[in-house]
Amino acid sequence: TNISIWAGESAAIAGNAFATYLRPTGIAVSDLTKAELLDNDPANNSQLVSNRNSGFGIDVVFGDQSLANATGDDLWGAFFNPTKVELYDTLPLSRKLSSGASVPSGATGQYWIGDNGAPSTTQTTINGGTIGDIDDPAVLIVNGDLKISGNTVITGLIYVTGELSITGTPTIRGSVISENGPNSGNGTLNLIYAPFGGDGLANPNITNSASVIPGSWRDW
């Protein structure tokens, strides 16, 4: 897919630093090394598509009614095979963190943050640290709102049932999904799409995961 941002509701550009990039035409994923695929320097192996001056390019889709009309369970089912309850029940207690708790730096594999059940309005903050790596990514499921700040580096999938806000200068190598808005960013987020298992990166070892992670975590 050549989509950087996909939203069911409206979208707007805030901040001079906003920009999206795609791999240049004629260059396949297989032409690049793993290091090049994960490089967050837009001057390397990428072409500018969207920015504040030019507006949204072809890689930004918003107002998609199929997303706007989807329930939280519909969206969840596009990325995970088990239901939320089933997945929660498969995780050991060490992988279930209370609402508002932060994932420890250095963590890999799958974590559920928040209670099992109806989406929570409790905010979880991840401020700094490194979570996940290319050979053992993290799958973070936050039942509630999530704020990512500082110079956090996360490799893997982030799934938020509530609202997502970004401050600071975090780097995320993977994908971010949020069931509810509005979602906002006042910092400088570096988001490098990493498909893990379908577009040139090998299937990772997701510790304690019952999730299916092909292609774009799941092509839909």
Task: Give the ranges of each region predicted by the language model.
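Primarily marks folded extracellular/lumenal domains of secretory and cell-surface proteins
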Residues: T1-W220
